[in-house]
């Protein structure tokens, strides 16, 4: 997801997106630990999406 798309969302939507991404990251980490994960690049994508969401949340928090 692009940062410009995230900036259009409100704080509640961003928090919801963050919780979904964290759950996805947990699931991927468990799959990796049990050697069921085929595409390990998904971990990198989810990790960076989480960072993008947290960055936009920080920007919105500092605007107030």
UniProtKB/Swiss-Prot annotation:
InterPro entries: Ribosomal_protein_uL29, Ribosomal_uL29, Ribosomal_uL29_CS, Ribosomal_uL29_sf
Highest rank taxon of the organism: Bacteria
Record's keyword terms, sorted: Ribonucleoprotein, Ribosomal protein
GO biological process: translation
A Pfam family: Ribosomal_L29
GO cellular component entries: cytosolic large ribosomal subunit
Molecular function (Gene Ontology), one example: structural constituent of ribosome
CDD domains per record: Ribosomal_L29_HIP
Family annotation (Gene3D superfamilies): 1.10.287.310
Family as reported in the entry's similarity comment: Belongs to the universal ribosomal protein uL29 family.
Cross-referenced PANTHER family: 60S RIBOSOMAL PROTEIN L35/50S RIBOSOMAL PROTEIN L29, LARGE RIBOSOMAL SUBUNIT PROTEIN UL29C
Name by which UniProt lists this protein: Large ribosomal subunit protein uL29
Organism classification: Bacteria, Pseudomonadati, Pseudomonadota, Betaproteobacteria, Burkholderiales
Gene designation: rpmC
């Amino acid at each position: 997801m692009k940062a410009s798309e995230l900036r259009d969302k409100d704080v509640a939507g961003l928090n919801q997106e963050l919780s979904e991404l964290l759950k996805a990251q947990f699931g991927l980490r468990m799959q990796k630990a049990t050697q069921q994960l085929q595409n390990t690049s998904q971990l990198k994508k989810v990790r960076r999406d989480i960072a993008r969401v947290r960055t936009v949340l920080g920007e919105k928090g500092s605007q107030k």
